[in-house]
């Protein structure tokens, strides 16, 4: 009887203690690439509020960054510096979401370059198309 109660107590304790991913759920930061008239496109909030062509974020290790393409153009992503990221296919298309996971501490620089120009897409813009650069400081 004592063994049964001890076994039941251990099982209850083991089930009640979160481990692995549940114990350390990674925060998710959401951003967008949005179309604007000046410079064609910029980084934006998850609600598509423009932030500018360059942006710096400070996040903790394990953070996931999701970037939604709310611009009608395709973009190529490239890592300029920092610990290696799993980029996969560098090209992303309108309406898709790109996810990066920052598993190691360091300073990462990611560049997003539009594949089609604003002229090719028949869009009227002011000035040259921006090349977007995102700096992510991971502590």
Regions found by a protein language model. Give the residues of each.
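Beta-strand cores of secreted/periplasmic/IMS beta-sandwich domains, seen most often
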Residues: 54-73, 77, 97-103
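Bacterial N-terminal signal peptides
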Residues: 7-16
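N-terminal edge beta-strand
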Residues: 26-64
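Positively charged n-region of N-terminal signal peptides that target proteins for export
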Residues: 1-4
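Extracellular/periplasmic metallocenter environments
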Residues: 27-36, 41-42, 91-139
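Sec/Tat signal peptide C-region and signal peptidase I cleavage site
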Residues: 19-26
